[in-house]
């Protein structure tokens, strides 16, 4: 097939590489950057409290992309903001399907998406001493259609090379996040939605979800975390591919709910995220069947991880 969102598999890639200039109250950045929308995705992978982010966050987020971003320089501003424009496809010629971090072939027909964020400091205004409210929005300008065989990304007319799709999981993504902490206790709550979800058959247009994640630092080394997540949308919820998803179950469902219990051990008190051991147990339940009458996964998953950052 020609002119599809597809690319060759290479053994090298850049995850992030950018130039940043702080011009007083405004900071400018250009290069390959992670578009930071939704609370869990805004958090670095080295600092997340669970072994994997929530399912709907992973479904709606984009990969790192080449783009341009501006934002307020001081993270302590009462009102914060950010805006960016990003490429949708990275890649060169080829026919492979695995690597999604290939460097870009710059072409205006690659199309793009935009992101915007507003945040407001709610510290001392609610029940936690330090807190912030975030509103994220992303809009994707790419035109796509239904393609059940390779899960989306209709042929692009006149497109001279293939490219792996890197953009958002829906044409429009909205997320409202509130994060707060007081002492050793932290809480993150998030509601999000994706409108016109890509890669699904007709009728699976929209998806909605909520995440609630409290955590508590018992000692400088030991931390406990609980997460409840729910995602719903008519045959539009995409399951994880790395952990809970099993080939004997459908990759989509109408509704998913999951409860995660985890414990993290930080090896170095002075730099907690430099090296840590994470253990988590999660029960997930799905409702509905896909077009082939296959059910999604319902059951337990157990994971242990050693994560480093240096």
State where each predicted segment sits.
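Loop-centered beta-sheet repeat module
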Residues: 88-150
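General secondary-structure edge motif
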Residues: 50-51, 98, 158
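Weak global preference for isoleucine
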Residues: 26, 30-33, 37, 48-51, ...
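Outer membrane beta-barrel
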Residues: 1-91, 110-125, 210-236
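Short alpha-helical interface elements
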Residues: 44, 51, 55-58, 95, ...
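Charge-dense, low-complexity intrinsically disordered segments
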Residues: 57, 105, 165
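Outer-membrane beta-barrel pore domains
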Residues: 6, 127-310
